[in-house]
From Swiss-Prot:
A GO CC term assigned to this protein in UniProt: cytoplasm
First-tier enzyme category under EC: transferase
Predominant subcellular localization, coarse grouping: cytoplasm
Any one Pfam family match given in the protein's UniProt record, by short name: Radical_SAM
Protein's organism: Marinomonas sp. (strain MWYL1)
Record-level Gene Ontology MF annotations: 4 iron, 4 sulfur cluster binding; metal ion binding; rRNA (adenine(2503)-C2-)-methyltransferase activity; rRNA binding; tRNA (adenine(37)-C2)-methyltransferase activity; tRNA binding
Annotated catalytic residues: 97, 346
Protein name, entry field: Dual-specificity RNA methyltransferase RlmN
Gene it is expressed from: rlmN
Catalyzed chemical reaction(s): adenosine(2503) in 23S rRNA + 2 reduced [2Fe-2S]-[ferredoxin] + 2 S-adenosyl-L-methionine = 2-methyladenosine(2503) in 23S rRNA + 5'-deoxyadenosine + L-methionine + 2 oxidized [2Fe-2S]-[ferredoxin] + S-adenosyl-L-homocysteine; adenosine(37) in tRNA + 2 reduced [2Fe-2S]-[ferredoxin] + 2 S-adenosyl-L-methionine = 2-methyladenosine(37) in tRNA + 5'-deoxyadenosine + L-methionine + 2 oxidized [2Fe-2S]-[ferredoxin] + S-adenosyl-L-homocysteine
Amino acid sequence: MTDIKKVNLLGLSPEKLIEFFESIGEKKFRATQVIKWIHQKGAESFEEMTDVSKALRAKLEQICEIRGPEVVSQNISTDGTRKWIIRTEGGKNDCVETVLIPDGDRATLCVSSQVGCSLDCSFCSTGKQGFNRNLTPAEIIGQVWIAIKSFGPMDPNGPRRVTNVVMMGMGEPLMNFEPVVDAMILMMHDHAYGLSKRRVTLSTSGVVPKIYELVKRTDVSLAISLHAPNDALRNELVPINKKYPIAELLEACQFYLENLPDKRHITIEYTLMSGVNDNEEQAHELAELLKVLECKINLIPFNPFPHSGYEKPSNNRTRRFQKILADAGYTVTVRTTRGDDIDAACGQLVGDFHDKTRRSQKYIELREVKS
């Protein structure tokens, strides 16, 4: 007799959880009870849910489960940054990385959306590793669940252990649209994690059609991985630009802002690489390019990884680039490198997985030819 596959309630959005409970003949309020137990109290079993009837708990035990991803390891940087390697349902060689960055009374969790990445940005370690598959909603929200639970029993009335979530880990979130949206809805729902829409940020390399779709589904904050002031250079650094060039991307960003219920800005992410995109002329070009968009700019000095071929710019060069943009009227921040001693900094996440694209092997072969 074949075992019945249990429904994992961890990844169900509130709407889908209500639908599920109604489908098994239960009242809507039961879904609210269960979602609070899972996401606010960290319950791992139905037996813990003391305000749920014994009969319903027994029923759920038969057909459901609460199963998060498995933590393979946790590393803590000298600056307090934490990195988890998390095993997904794909097996022992399908692991992603999740990073928690503390900063005073803030704690930002960087969440992965894919096992590997389906894009091939030239300066990103994840992209060099290739791609296996998309994460499920349970594997995405499970990263938040794991991070919060790592500090001990969850207390819905205590201080927030995670104040901000950024979809900036491994993978391109908009290439895994539905699971990412479901997970973000859970992050912001009052009965789950209750994060403000301004404190949940999705970062994309520019999957233009999905930006138009995203604003119809949710109103999270949006960040764009731009990294170049023109199409010629961006085509080299961010290959998806060949399909969706900068003008189309900025037009989609403008549409996103115009359709939000409140006034906000887009965050432009720009990784500075020495001798590649960090000269004064390029700073002026970027300032001119972004005049059409309400935005702030986050400069990210490149974080080296083996065989990347790029170098971090000098502090003087970074400050000069920042000043040119600030003088043009932009709010400009320079991201402080955090967690680089445990390979948890921006662009360094690689995980451990089977690469279906053979991209990682191709890069190894290419390096051997050049050496």
